[in-house]
């Protein structure tokens, strides 16, 4: 068997880099010389000194969401690979629920406008034979609803303009619940502009449901017995105490509606960017702008309105006052917001608003400069026109002066 050095000295085209790229070790077998040429077999042997570590491919995928504009749309959240098992026992909980120990239901959140008149909502719901409850005064109205044999709770959030249903499909919410309170919506959106968030939840309503989970890890069971929480992509509602369970649902509803309300502003921002992109491209190409100052002012007005809805006119950037005095509800609200990436999304939206505002200000400055240049030319033309008049008047005076007879001419005539 020949060494690598003798092989490379004979076959100059073989390099150590090429052999490394093959990922194998090469050896020469039965090498002999015939007719002045090397002949032999190259045997490939798999490397045994390299250990291939197994990679955990247990990666959580984003749940697909149906939207009227786009049949399938990813939720605005990010996932990272699960390279190790969680230590708090939540993986055990998810595995247990996947075996149909408890029924997994859908929690649908739909934002239909900027807000709801809750007093009018209660009147409309009462007219339909429902029994609304002012769960959180001036903030959330809740009522029980039944559709196609499914019974669940529905919450209307007045400040966010959102409806959160617990136990119903998206089509049921759109076709049955939203029309009931449509008249109470403030600045409603078009149907195709509704923003929707979908999550699964499990509700523990009695001791029997709790017993179904008694086989879980001891670290998880005590937590289920005392509070509601978020486990991965699954909401766990503890309704052993029905009143506390409704408050927990309200906290989850506030976090979910925060996401859909933010999604409305994100969509408005994307529409603005798509409108102004052609203008920016035309400027880069040196094309003459067919843009009026009023259009630029409307554009920057839209940006200020989006920024105001994000930072001033709503509680998107802060925790509602209600949850400050309720640590458990505050934890639920913050966990949902963290899971839906509310903080990073707000920062990204503010960055886009900053850039777009600077862009609009540059356009307004450009238009003002163009208008000032136009006015300067008008002034120049007026000065030139006035100068022509002055020259003409001077010529007339000079001509009349030259045509008048002088004293010498008068003496000569005498």
UniProtKB/Swiss-Prot annotation:
InterPro entries in UniProt: DUF155, RMD1/Sad1-interacting
Compartments it resides in: Mitochondrion inner membrane
Recorded topology in the membrane: Single-pass membrane protein
Transmembrane residue ranges: 374-394
Keyword Nucleotide-binding carried by entry: no
Main location: mitochondrion
Entry's Gene Ontology cellular component terms: mitochondrial inner membrane
One family name in Pfam for this protein: DUF155
Record's keyword terms, sorted: Membrane, Mitochondrion, Mitochondrion inner membrane, Transit peptide, Transmembrane, Transmembrane helix
Mitochondrial intermembrane side: 395-414
Interval spanned by the transit peptide: 1-29
Ranges per topology, Mitochondrial matrix: 30-373
Entry's Gene Ontology BP terms: positive regulation of mitochondrial translation
Described function: Component of MIOREX complexes, large expressome-like assemblies of ribosomes with factors involved in all the steps of post-transcriptional gene expression.
Similarity comment: family membership: Belongs to the RMD1/sif2 family.
Quaternary structure and partners: Associates with the mitochondrial ribosome.
UniProt name for this protein: MIOREX complex component 10
Species this protein is from: Saccharomyces cerevisiae (strain ATCC 204508 / S288c)
């Amino acid at each position: 068997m020949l060494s690598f050095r003798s092989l490379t000295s004979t076959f100059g085209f073989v390099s150590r880099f090429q052999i490394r790229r093959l990922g194998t070790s090469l050896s020469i077998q039965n090498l002999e010389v015939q007719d002045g040429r090397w002949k032999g077999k190259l045997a490939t042997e798999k490397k045994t000194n390299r250990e291939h570590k197994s990679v955990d491919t247990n990666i959580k995928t984003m749940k697909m969401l149906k939207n009227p504009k786009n049949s399938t749309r990813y939720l605005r959240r990010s996932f990272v690979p699960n390279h190790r098992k969680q230590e708090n026992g939540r993986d055990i909980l998810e595995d247990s629920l996947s075996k149909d120990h408890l029924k997994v239901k859908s929690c649908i959140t739909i934002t239909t406008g900027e807000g709801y008149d809750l007093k009018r909502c209660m009147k409309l719901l009462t007219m339909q034979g429902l029994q609304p409850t002012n769960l959180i005064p001036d903030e959330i109205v809740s009522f029980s609803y039944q559709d196609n044999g499914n019974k669940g709770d529905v919450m209307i959030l007045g400040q966010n303009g959102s409806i959160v249903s617990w136990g119903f499909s998206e089509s049921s919410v759109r076709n049955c619940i939203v029309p009931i309170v449509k008249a109470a919506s403030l600045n409603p959106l078009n149907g195709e502009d509704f923003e929707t968030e979908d999550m699964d939840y499990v509700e523990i309503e009695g001791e029997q449901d709790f017993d179904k989970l008694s086989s879980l890890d001891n670290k998880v069971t005590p937590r289920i017995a005392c509070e509601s929480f978020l486990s991965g992509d699954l909401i766990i509602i503890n309704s052993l105490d029905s009143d506390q369970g409704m408050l927990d649902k309200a906290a989850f509803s506030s976090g979910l509606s925060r996401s859909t309300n933010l999604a409305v502003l994100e969509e408005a921002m994307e529409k603005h960017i798509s409108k102004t992109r052609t203008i920016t491209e035309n400027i880069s190409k040196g094309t003459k702008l067919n843009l009026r100052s009023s259009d630029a002012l409307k554009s920057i007005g839209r940006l200020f309105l989006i920024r105001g809805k994000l930072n001033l006119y709503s509680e998107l950037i802060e925790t509602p006052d209600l949850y400050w005095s309720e640590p458990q509800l505050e934890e639920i609200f913050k966990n949902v917001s963290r899971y839906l990436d509310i903080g990073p999304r707000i920062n990204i939206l503010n960055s886009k608003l900053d850039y777009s505002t600077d862009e609009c200000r540059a356009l307004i400055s450009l238009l003002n400069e163009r208008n000032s240049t136009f006015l300067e030319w008008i002034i120049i033309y007026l000065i030139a026109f006035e100068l022509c008049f002055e020259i003409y008047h001077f010529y007339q005076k000079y001509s009349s002066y030259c045509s008048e007879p002088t004293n010498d001419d008068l003496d000569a005539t005498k």
